[in-house]
Regions:
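Acidic, low-complexity intrinsically disordered regions
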Residues: 37, 53, 65, 123, ...
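A glycine-biased structural micro-motif
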Residues: 5-15
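General N-terminal targeting signals
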Residues: 25, 30, 99, 105-107, ...
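...with weaker cross-activation on analogous glycine-rich loops/strands in unrelated enzymes
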Residues: 44-117
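Active-site nucleophilic cysteine motif
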Residues: 13-32
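Short, Lys/Arg-rich amphipathic alpha-helical interaction segments
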Residues: 108, 113-142
Length: 142
């Protein structure tokens, strides 16, 4: 296991402070020295990625609108091409983005589920069936 991620494990989910996107933002800032998600917060009118209105903020955008923003800073990749730091957007059946995860290695990703704690999980078929898209930030050196 890569010890770099230990400091991101066990964070308590709270929409106004720690959520699935702010976890990824924190990893990008600390590990990649990237502020790429600052543009997302501006795009979503969500200062710092911390909504004041709890879960309601997720109704303000769709997978399509999120992918429109992502396409300006990242490249869409296939599930078979996953690399460390790729961002996974999960969806509900209504194409509403419901969750975000960050691919790490060997079929594992880190995420912060609603009502839970951040942890590393296996990208099982159940998770794969919920993937809307996967994005690789253009600043990643491959």
């Amino acid at each position: 296991m890569d010890l770099r991620y230990n400091k991101y494990l066990g964070l308590n989910h709270n929409y106004t402070e720690n959520n699935c996107i702010t976890l990824i933002d924190s990893i990008y800032k600390n590990e990649l020295n990237s502020n790429v998600f600052d543009g997302l917060w501006e795009y979503l009118d969500l200062p710092g990625g911390k909504p004041k209105d709890g879960r309601k903020w997720m109704k303000r955008f769709s997978v399509d609108s999120l992918e429109t923003w992502a396409s300006t800073v990242a490249t869409k990749v296939n599930l078979t091409d996953l690399q460390e730091y790729d961002v996974i957007i999960f969806k509900s059946g209504r194409l509403v983005p419901t969750h975000f995860g960050l691919y790490l290695w060997a079929n594992k990703f880190i995420h912060l589920p609603e009502g839970g704690f951040s942890h590393i999980d296996v990208l099982t078929q159940e998770w794969r069936d919920q993937i809307a898209s996967i994005w690789r930030w253009n600043g990643i050196n491959t």
